[in-house]
């Protein structure tokens, strides 16, 4: 019975792990818009523990009142501040949502970053769920203007240690404000 339980858990988690490692090719192809002007935060895939257990363990009481945190939470994610910092300018806010985290420490291991404009969801900075120490994980995110932001992503090869990606790229996004939508417009290698 115990072996069966282990196999079921492994089979459930394996597709998510493989997907998170192999879908980062979006950084290697010409940029294409993945966010749509639906205003709906994409639903979270199940993590390694329930949303309520992860919320109790890693949730932030300072994120309970914002409209963005409410929308992220309602979609099954646990809201968090990326690098423990508020990322906001004018009415643009970037908020993290996780479905798994390290224990102890609560470092997100399955997450995405959600962009809100005037409290309305505009899109995610990555078309896939990201994981720490994996190719395509987000680093610094900056709101550079009322209609623009940038995000840096680590690029790992199979020979890189988790601490040390081979390179970094920066994606620049335009925010279409009428029906808030996040659109990637440029990708540049930084190193």
Regions found by a protein language model. Name each.
Residues 1-4:
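Positively charged n-region of N-terminal signal peptides that target proteins for export
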Residues 6-15:
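Bacterial N-terminal signal peptides
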Residues 20-191:
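Exposed acidic/polar residues on beta-strands and adjacent loops within beta-sheet cores, strongest
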């Amino acid at each position: 019975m115990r072996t069966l339980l282990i196999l079921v858990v492994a089979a459930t988690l394996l597709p998510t792990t493989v997907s998170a490692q192999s879908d980062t090719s979006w950084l290697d192809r010409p940029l294409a818009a993945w966010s749509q002007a639906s205003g709906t935060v994409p639903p979270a895939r199940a993590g390694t523990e329930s949303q309520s257990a992860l919320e109790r363990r890693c949730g932030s009481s300072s994120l309970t009142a914002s409209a963005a945190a409410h929308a992220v939470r309602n979609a099954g994610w646990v809201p968090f501040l990326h690098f423990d910092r508020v990322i906001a300018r004018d009415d643009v806010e970037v908020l993290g949502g996780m479905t798994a985290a390290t224990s102890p420490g609560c470092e997100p291991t399955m997450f995405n970053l959600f962009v809100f404009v005037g409290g309305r969801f505009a899109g995610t900075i990555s078309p896939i769920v990201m994981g720490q120490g994996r190719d395509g994980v987000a680093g610094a995110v900056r709101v550079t203007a009322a209609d623009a932001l940038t995000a840096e992503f680590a690029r790992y090869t199979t020979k890189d240690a988790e601490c040390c990606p081979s390179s970094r790229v920066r994606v620049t996004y335009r925010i279409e404000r009428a029906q808030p939508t996040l659109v990637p417009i440029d990708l540049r290698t930084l190193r």
